[in-house]
Amino acid sequence: ERDEIMEFVKAFVIGGLICVVGQIFTNCYGAWGLEKQDAGTAASMTLVALSALLTGLSVYDDIAKHAGAGTLVPITGFANAIAAPAVEFKTEGFVLGVGAKMFTIAGPVIVYGLAASVVYGFIYWLYTIL
């Protein structure tokens, strides 16, 4: 049970550190003149790019071994889910390797996320006209 508690603590701390880094990027982009929403978008894009880079360098997996869900839940985990299969299957070529396998993990998330947004958008639209 003690190991399980430590896993929770490590996931919480590392996931929190990822969020702190994202907030630092947001603050920096804001200080450089971007509006709040644009700064948040730029910070998210930066985190995605950094996590894809760390995945390609095989560093992200080492972090994830210690952090567990702390690296999977933030947006960085989604970037890792797309980049990892792309790196793994690059030897099979760009079309049948990278292109075909890149969304094996993230594809269902995209499909169901899009479907849910359509349903919620329709419900919101109905709510606004009633």
Regions found by a protein language model. Give the residues of each.
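Residue-level signature of transmembrane alpha-helical entry/exit and packing/kink sites
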Residues: 7, 11, 43-44
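Juxtamembrane boundary at the C-terminal end of a transmembrane helix
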Residues: 120-130
